[in-house]
């Protein structure tokens, strides 16, 4: 789980770890890339990161680096933006799914993961 919003990471980590999944949270993509040796099955990745006074990689840059390391890892991209052209761009890049950060985030992530792995969480 990679998101610079502590509310989102806490919500997702609590929900899915309570179901028995091992989940780690990172604030920024660079931290996630550094942990790729752990061979995750899935990465939930924010589309936009902000860090005052520092240059950080955006979600697409992180995705590209992740895929250089492991082409088989599944990636769900999160965003507060609900734009059709963004969804198409992400699909062309090879993102496995796209979930909007809204009031249905947990349910939508659950559905996405279920579809990707073929099981209920």
Language-model segment annotations:
Residues 57, 61, 81-99, 103, ...:
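Alpha4 helix (beta4-alpha4-beta5 surface) of REC/receiver domains from two-component response regulators
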Residues 1-7, 12-16, 42-43:
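Conserved acidic segment of CheY-like receiver
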Residues 34, 54-71:
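Short amphipathic alpha-helix used as the core "switch/output" element in two-component signaling
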Residues 43, 75, 98-99:
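Two-component signal transduction core modules
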Residues 108-121:
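Receiver (REC) domain switch/output surface
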Residues 14-19, 89:
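Alpha-helical interaction/dimerization surfaces of two-component signaling modules
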Residues 24-42, 46-51, 108:
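Acidic, metal-coordinating helix/loop segments flanking the phosphotransfer/catalytic sites
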């Amino acid at each position: 789980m990679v998101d610079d919003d502590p509310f989102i990471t806490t919500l997702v980590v609590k929900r899915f770890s309570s179901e028995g999944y091992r989940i780690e949270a990172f604030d920024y993509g660079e931290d996630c890339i550094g942990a790729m040796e752990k061979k995750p099955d899935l990465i939930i990745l924010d589309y936009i990161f902000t860090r005052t006074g520092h240059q950080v990689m955006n979600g697409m840059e992180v995705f590209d680096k992740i895929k250089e390391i492991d082409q088989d890892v599944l990636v769900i991209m999160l965003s507060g933006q609900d734009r059709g052209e963004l969804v198409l761009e992400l699909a062309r890049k090879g993102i496995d799914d796209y979930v909007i950060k809204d009031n249905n985030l947990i349910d939508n992530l659950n559905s996405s993961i279920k579809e990707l792995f073929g099981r209920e969480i």
